[in-house]
């Protein structure tokens, strides 16, 4: 790493984390030095994570978010090893009459595809749909499109639940370290299940969650990516000891799972409480990893 401006940093044997702005920190990472990237970006202004001017979740419009996010996409392309992959977790975003003047959905996943393609990435997989229970979504959001009373009133405003997506992109070029699997560790039945474009078996509650990371009135939501999704992506597109990078680390879900699977991790987080909690989580993951290695040594 070249000299970078950070608020804080910490590390273990298998991980480095930086407390700061993801674009600033990413600029200090050497070119083609990361083997896999996985993250969940801020969903524009749908959720507010902090009151920082550098928080992309505080953008005033979709256009402003895209302008800021393009700087990061450029750095992600630069630091990723040729022939390697980047997985992005996202969802399409609700439009509200109060904020947007209409009720509907914004094609956020499509906007991300266009930003990453403009940066040089190739779309590697279709949008893998991760099913979410529409009843749970209705109870949490009270979205008019999911209410049964709206079906009775005027179902032209009724719609289906909004799923999560996992989209994977690839940096063109020859992969210098092919990712190999054996039939024993990756049986054909597992591949047939994972090759489906809709994943019905993801447990939405299997996340790295910690209430103590909530601290400010301006924060409304913690949305960690399901560990099961991270595990599948890391299994598919990395080798043991590869470097897994996440620019929006949150409380450390992607890095935590990477360490548990014998990979190295680099993460960046801007919010104070998330950063502090991620350090605790990564220390715990590393302790567990080395304890298991000692047990079977």
Predicted regions and their residues:
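Class I S-adenosyl-L-methionine-dependent methyltransferase module
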Residues: 111-112, 279-297
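Core catalytic lobe of class I
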Residues: 2-277
């Amino acid at each position: 790493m070249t000299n970078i401006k950070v608020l804080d940093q910490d590390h273990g044997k298998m991980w480095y984390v930086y407390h700061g702005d993801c674009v600033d920190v990413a600029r200090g990472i050497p070119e083609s030095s990361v083997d896999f990237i996985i993250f969940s970006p801020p969903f524009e202004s749908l959720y507010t994570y902090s009151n920082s001017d550098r928080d992309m979740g505080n953008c005033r419009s979709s256009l402003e978010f895209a302008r800021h996010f393009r700087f990061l996409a450029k750095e992600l392309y630069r630091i990723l090893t040729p022939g390697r992959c980047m997985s992005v977790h996202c969802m399409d975003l609700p439009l509200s009459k109060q904020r947007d003047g209409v009720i509907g959905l914004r094609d956020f996943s499509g906007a991300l595809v266009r930003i990453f393609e403009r940066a040089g990435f190739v779309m590697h997989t279709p949008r893998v749909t991760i099913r979410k229970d529409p009843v749970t979504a209705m109870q949490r959001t009270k979205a008019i499109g999911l209410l049964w009373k709206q079906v009775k009133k005027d179902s032209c405003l009724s719609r289906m639940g909004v799923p999560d997506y996992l989209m994977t992109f690839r940096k063109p070029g020859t992969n210098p370290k092919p990712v190999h699997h054996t039939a024993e560790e990756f049986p054909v039945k597992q591949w047939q299940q994972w090759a489906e474009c809709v994943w019905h078996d993801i447990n939405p509650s299997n996340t790295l969650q910690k209430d103590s990371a909530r601290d400010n009135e301006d924060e409304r939501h913690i949305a960690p990516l399901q560990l099961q999704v991270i595990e599948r992506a890391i299994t598919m597109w990395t080798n043991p000891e590869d470097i897994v990078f996440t620019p929006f680390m949150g409380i450390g879900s992607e890095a935590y799972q990477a360490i548990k699977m014998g990979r190295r991790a680099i993460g960046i987080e801007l919010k104070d409480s998330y950063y502090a909690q991620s350090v605790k989580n990564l220390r715990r993951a590393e302790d567990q990893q080395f304890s298991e290695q000692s047990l079977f040594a």
